[in-house]
Amino acid sequence: MLAIISPAKTLDYQSAVPKFEISQPQLTQYSQQLIDICKQLSPAQIASLMSISDKLAGLNAARFADWQADHNEQNARPAIYAFKGDVYTGLDVESLTSDDVLFAQQHLRMLSGLYGLLKPLDLMQPYRLEMGTKLANKKGKDLYAFWGNVITQTLQQALDEQGDNILVNLASDEYYKAVQASQLKARIIKPVFLDNKGGKYKVISFYAKKARGLMCRYIIQNRLTEAEQLKEFNLAGYWFDEAASTKDEFVFKRDLGE
């Protein structure tokens, strides 16, 4: 079983990181091409392209300028310890054991606008480049055109290496769109998390993101290998609704109350 999640805009490069045998990102030759484009952009152009403040644009212009093809423990940190955000709050990597993290290294991947696909212990330098960014490049008008089938092929390789064909899509639509799902030799399971607020079950973004992280945590801690095992997920009050689910879309519901 291989799970995929989105990255996060919020990054942490300050806190301590446990000692692991780190890995190198696989697609840095592509990352370098994107960095070369981004280095040509002024802070004002970055602000416009990414719809961010001038202050954030200045920070990210500096990050692009500082980015190096050589990733080491002085200029980078393992991706799973760098990303912070709702999904990663649910995952809560700081409380996972070393064995859990090593399991995740085989069974979890993070999609990325700059790096394409990351393993948890892949070194990553600070950046901001969301997959939906309309960054013109030699292959087209945006990052979907740039990555083409590269992410899909790398994902297939990861699926093959971990031993089965089950892919659990816990990524946002923006990032999953970079995966050419029809090209994968995989059974793709999509968990959906609905919260009952005011008498109606619906996707509430903040809760759904955190739940996707919780599902990752559940897969990792319980060493799941079968799709059916996902249905037993019950963290944070969620329960599997068989009637609302389909063969490959697993619906989990939770009652928040009024």
UniProtKB/Swiss-Prot annotation:
InterPro entries: YaaA. One of its GO terms (cellular component) is cytosol. GO terms for biological process: response to hydroperoxide. Belongs to the UPF0246 family. This is UPF0246 protein MS0374. It comes from Mannheimia succiniciproducens (strain KCTC 0769BP / MBEL55E).
